[in-house]
Amino acid sequence: MGKCPLSRLEVRRICKWFDNKFNKEVYENIVEERVFKSLKGLGNPSSESLKAGRVNLRNHENYLEWLLKNRTFIAGEFFSIADIICAAYLSTLDYLGEVGWERINLTKKWYAQIKSRPSFRDILEEKLFTIPASKHYKNPDF
């Protein structure tokens, strides 16, 4: 998590940001609506929720891009749990084709490095029930 207290604090801050803010504003509005709502038999996705989630995702994408303009990894100059958490959330959204990769080149480059790691290969082979993955999902060099 980093050697100095400020580095560890930044890792924790980013993790909390994903687990609270990103989860509430993006994941619940897109993934919960598109994937889990139908599986639970709760009807069709709410277009209002999807729209809100997509607007929020663009804001979060801009923040990730800003972070990576100033650092090598999400929380600093070292790979950390913050990168793993970020990659996990983005992976699901990427699977669904929701991420605007054409707008966020630094984030795309960072994510391609994560997708290329041997530990990420199994994730790229997973399937979300009957939902097909986006065309580029399994390709680390998308």
What kind of region is each of these model predictions?
Residues 1-51, 141:
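GST-like domain detector, emphasizing the conserved glutathione-binding G-site
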Residues 11, 64, 83, 114-117:
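Residue-level signal for nonpolar/aromatic packing positions in well-ordered secondary structure
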Residues 50-67:
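Amphipathic alpha-helical packing segments from all-alpha helical-bundle domains
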Residues 127-142:
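Acidic/histidine-enriched, glycine/proline-rich intrinsically disordered or flexible terminal extensions
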